[in-house]
Amino acid sequence: MTEIVDIIAREILDSRGNPTVEVDVILEDGAFGRAAVPSGASTGAHEANEKRDGDKARYLGKGVQQAVDAVNGEIFDALSGVDAEDQRRVDNLMIELDGTPNKARLGANAILGVSLATAKAAAESAGLPLYKYVGGVNARVLPTPMMNIINGGAHADNPIDIQEFMILPTGAKDFREGLRMGAEIFHALKKALKDAGHNTNVGDEGGFAPNLASAEAALDFIVKAGEKAGYKAGDDFVLGLDVASTEFFKNGKYELEGEGKSLDPAAMVDYLAGLVAKFPILTIEDGMAEDDFDGWKLLTDTLGKKVQLVGDDLFVTNPKRLQMGLDKGLANSILVKVNQIGTLSETIDAVELAHRHGYTSVMSHRSGETEDSTIADLAVALNCGQIKTGSLARSDRTAKYNQLLRIQEMLDDQGVYAGRAALKGR
């Protein structure tokens, strides 16, 4: 009854106006699953391959018709009649069919769309919400949100070098209250920026992109906005950074052009340690470049006991890259982006490997998103304890927060808010 009888892919638009892949999977019993695939702006070199057509006469070369055709053609042929409840078999069949180490032939965007839509169809067939179908009875931890409220780097047209400045409402009693705290700080920040003469347009992920001279200026604005909203930084909420340092690592130096600094890896570690000393920053993502392993080791040895150090470009949700990091003692947390690896099964493997070794995990969106809220369910299903899905503006971001509100309602008194515990004693 749960055999796959139809798979339909189409080209839709993401939140940046670029095409992406959406997939419908239909089972023999009539159950239906739909998934839309996200896309990143700052991408790691070791990510699975997102297939784009390259035809400049169509969508400026960013079309995904080849990926759509792969789903409607060879992927459907390979999966027709396969049991959707056997997720690992579905995923492995697509990996084998692709035949490349990074899913370059069919495209990770094609494969992921089918993988997630299959899980959603199987969940519907079982009469379960996705978080419970994937995670079972232990899926009850509502994640602490990392809310990206000031954007810089590749996510904004401003001089700020660091890509994301985030708040984490760790002092909230539940997810609903944490979301409210975030929204109130967001609006207080908007007023503070406006009063100071800055623009309050929002970037790709819904955060503000003011022309501030330094990371310290951005952090200062956020702390003061929190106070205006009635919350104390360090108690009610803490701060997080996504440095995205691979983006400005050139010839062995970290080129902070906005701040006029050219730093070697040791100086970059000192720079980040200086920010941590001045502000209640408890999580830093991609503090060093993806292949600067010596820099990562120094950062981990310097800050790893008191700050969550998240590997995004470093690990690209890949169990093999994560194992390398575990062996070398790099970072202490993994960012989880389903489209970096390209299947649900491999995503689960990466999270489980991280948790087995005491690393934390953060479920994440991409800068190019859709209304699809699958990652909200997966954050709960995989007991990530943290989710990073943008600011408190733009429906492509709030779709995930709103789904978590629904999940909190479904879990009722069984649900637990991760809060500060998600940061493992930091």
Curated annotation (Swiss-Prot):
Its EC number is 4.2.1.11. It is found in: Cytoplasm; Secreted; Cell surface. Gene3D superfamilies: Enolase-like C-terminal domain (3.20.20.120), Enolase-like, N-terminal domain (3.30.390.10). It is an enzyme of class 4 (lyase). Keywords: Cytoplasm, Glycolysis, Lyase, Magnesium, Metal-binding, Secreted. One of its GO terms (molecular function) is magnesium ion binding. One of its GO terms (biological process) is glycolytic process. InterPro entries: Enolase, Enolase-like_C_sf, Enolase-like_N, Enolase_C, Enolase_CS, Enolase_N. Binds a second Mg(2+) ion via substrate during catalysis. Mg(2+) binds at residues 242, 285, 312. The keyword Cytoplasm applies. PROSITE patterns: ENOLASE. It catalyses: (2R)-2-phosphoglycerate = phosphoenolpyruvate + H2O. One of its GO terms (cellular component) is cell surface. The active site is at residues 205, 337. (2R)-2-phosphoglycerate binds at residues 163, 337, 366-367, 388. Pfam families: Enolase_C, Enolase_N. Its cofactor is Mg(2+). Pathway: Carbohydrate degradation; glycolysis; pyruvate from D-glyceraldehyde 3-phosphate: step 4/5. Catalyzes the reversible conversion of 2-phosphoglycerate (2-PG) into phosphoenolpyruvate (PEP). It is essential for the degradation of carbohydrates via glycolysis. Belongs to the enolase family. This is Enolase. The lineage of its organism: Bacteria, Pseudomonadati, Pseudomonadota, Alphaproteobacteria, Caulobacterales. The gene is eno.
